[in-house]
């Protein structure tokens, strides 16, 4: 092996309902993940030990990095001492609710499982992924839309993809997941919508009547504390989006567009101020 370069894509959340809190302190949720065309690039090179470098000094390249955590977890599971040098070119904003770190970890697991010829059973790989982060199994196991419950690790592949243009904007605020869970406004007692059926109605029939129920429970608190993030959502709708929402715990916000022209105009507008990604219809992770 000289080196192998792969893309690690980001995700957005279509609806995010916080449904309860477990005894171990983790919150349970219900959401639908969708991939977007915003990615980090990871390069894996032969090495005697484990090492890592990162394109930005804002992220650690030490044992706290999820890529190295993933490599070490895989080595420990397999009882091996193989090495690899990982180079991370970071493009997905962190603290954005886009799952960049989780995607990097999942990519590391998938690539090293193949490079080290481990053939780890899917169930065991899922367990390793969940130990690294609740979003990691999504990036490891699916390519398009997926319905998630538990803490985000229980997945059902919806075998579909969004038939719309997606404009995703990072307003520059780094919001920690810990902060978001401490500050969201609980709404545990309610009649939860059927997210799976709503996604089918939206993707297969363009049934926009389901959109008001696609809520993100982090939005009210995030918007109260970060009014600039609220403004981005409002502007996405003003620019022609038929739906806009916070992704995850933020601060990234995305809008769905029927017309390419409107999506391109919106992306052009926001690029004057913030990092932006434009994703084509029916996008899947490859």
From Swiss-Prot:
Pathway: Isoprenoid biosynthesis; isopentenyl diphosphate biosynthesis via DXP pathway; isopentenyl diphosphate from 1-deoxy-D-xylulose 5-phosphate: step 3/6. One of its GO terms (biological process) is isopentenyl diphosphate biosynthetic process, methylerythritol 4-phosphate pathway. It is an enzyme of class 2 (transferase). Keywords: ATP-binding, Isoprene biosynthesis, Kinase, Nucleotide-binding, Transferase. ATP binds at residues 93-103. It catalyses: 4-CDP-2-C-methyl-D-erythritol + ATP = 4-CDP-2-C-methyl-D-erythritol 2-phosphate + ADP + H(+). It holds the Pfam family GHMP_kinases_N. Signal peptide: none annotated. Its EC number is 2.7.1.148. GO terms for molecular function: 4-(cytidine 5'-diphospho)-2-C-methyl-D-erythritol kinase activity; ATP binding. The active site is at 11, 135. The keyword Magnesium does not apply. Catalyzes the phosphorylation of the position 2 hydroxy group of 4-diphosphocytidyl-2C-methyl-D-erythritol. Belongs to the GHMP kinase family. IspE subfamily. NCBIfam families: ispE. This is 4-diphosphocytidyl-2-C-methyl-D-erythritol kinase. It comes from Chlorobium phaeobacteroides (strain BS1). The gene is ispE.
């Amino acid at each position: 092996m000289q080196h192998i370069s792969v893309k690690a894509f980001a995700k957005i959340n279509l609806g995010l309902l916080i449904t309860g809190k477990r005894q171990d302190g983790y919150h349970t949720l219900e959401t639908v993940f969708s991939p977007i065309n915003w990615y980090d690039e990871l390069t894996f090179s032969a090495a005697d030990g484990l090492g890592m470098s990162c394109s930005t000094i804002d992220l650690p390249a030490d044992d706290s990095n999820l890529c190295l955590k993933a490599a070490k977890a895989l080595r420990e599971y397999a009882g091996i001492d193989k090495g690899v040098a990982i180079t991370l070119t970071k493009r997905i904003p962190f603290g954005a609710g886009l799952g960049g770190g989780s995607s990097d970890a999942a990519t590391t697991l998938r690539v090293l499982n193949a490079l080290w010829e481990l053939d780890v059973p899917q169930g065991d790989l899922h367990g390793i992924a969940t130990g690294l982060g609740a979003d990691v199994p999504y990036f490891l196991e699916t390519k398009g839309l997926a319905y998630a419950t538990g803490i985000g690790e229980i997945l059902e592949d919806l075998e579909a993809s969004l038939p719309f243009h997606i404009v995703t904007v990072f307003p520059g605020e780094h919001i920690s997941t810990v902060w978001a869970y401490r500050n969201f406004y609980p709404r545990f007692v309610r009649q939860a919508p059927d997210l799976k059926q709503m996604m089918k109605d939206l993707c297969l029939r363009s049934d926009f009547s389901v959109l008001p129920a696609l809520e993100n429970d982090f939005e009210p608190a995030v918007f109260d504390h970060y009014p600039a993030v609220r403004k981005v959502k409002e502007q996405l709708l003003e620019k022609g989006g038929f739906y806009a929402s916070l992704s995850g715990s933020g601060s990234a916000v995305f809008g769905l567009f029927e017309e390419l022209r409107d999506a391109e105009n919106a992306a052009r507008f926001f690029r004057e101020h913030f990092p932006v990604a434009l994703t084509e219809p029916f996008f899947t992770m490859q």
